[in-house]
């Protein structure tokens, strides 16, 4: 019992009996593998190869390969099964599908892939044509060879302008010449009706300008009317005022209408003359009088004539109510007519001279208007320097 029991040596397994050639299926000749590689390395290389193929850019789907028939595996005895599986692992993973494909079929698939890659530039070119506008016009230099163009691509040509253009008229498209159409469109001037907003300053300037035009006609008419009035008075009064009674009898019907019209025209002319000077600034108005400005002189003469004509209004009332001194209720006494009418005739003569002189001064420079200039000046000061130049140019 003290001695250790020695185990008998391990017996080798029985050598399998070699079967006949009919029982063992024929297999492809075994490829030599490089030293230092194991089946696991082959599996890793196959998986990396499949990932690289999947990472390639998308290409059009290859043509469908007809399904391949699976080869029936014959049953192999258990002792030869291990060696057979080791031989076929590399071929199974090389296909990636687990299907053993012969070499001839593998070359066909590779050729089909190369053909599909040739059609790839044509598809990318067509997508670029839709995105880039500069490539829409194809020149002769950039034309591709017929081998590179896709089979089913539409024919492309050089884009050139057509001489005729189709224009829609009365719900129908009619052909028209491009040159004539361009000429007609250039000759049409489209005027936009822009309604500018009026301010109080614009209204004041428009009224001022319109009243200045009316004043010009009034000045001329008043000068002519004053000359006519004084001529009629002297004709009716006679030489050295010998026929004063004749003047009173003939002129009493014209005293009120003539003097009223004269006063109206004189007042309009006076206001129009004062509108041409700036009375808001006394220094400017005084400087105009001292420098003999035509507008300042005309306004002064009109104002003087207006005061003189108003001073003789009572005499005009007495002329209108004239009755011979011999009649009862007459306000005229015998021998006093000449003394009353002589100052009235002289005043009318002076007024006529003043009105005529004012008209001459204003007609010398009718566009002279200091009020309008000052109003524009204050308006321009509100704008910056750039806008001032624009307004002056207008």
Curated annotation (Swiss-Prot):
Biased composition (Basic residues): 110-119
Taxonomy, superkingdom: Eukaryota
Membrane topology recorded in Swiss-Prot or TrEMBL: Multi-pass membrane protein
Annotated spans, Disordered: 1-135
Stretch forming the signal peptide: none
InterPro entries cross-referenced by the UniProt entry: TMEM237 (IPR029409)
Transmembrane segments: 213-233, 254-274, 288-308, 344-364
Keywords associated with the record: Cell projection, Cilium, Cilium biogenesis/degradation, Membrane, Transmembrane, Transmembrane helix
Biased composition (Polar residues): 80-97
One matching Pfam family: TMEM237
Keyword set includes Membrane: yes
Subcellular location: Membrane; Cell projection, Cilium
One Gene Ontology term, aspect cellular component: ciliary transition zone
One GO BP: cilium assembly
Chief place where the protein resides: membrane
Cited function: Component of the transition zone in primary cilia. Required for ciliogenesis.
Similarity comment: family membership: Belongs to the TMEM237 family.
Protein name (record): Transmembrane protein 237
Originating species: Gallus gallus (Chicken)
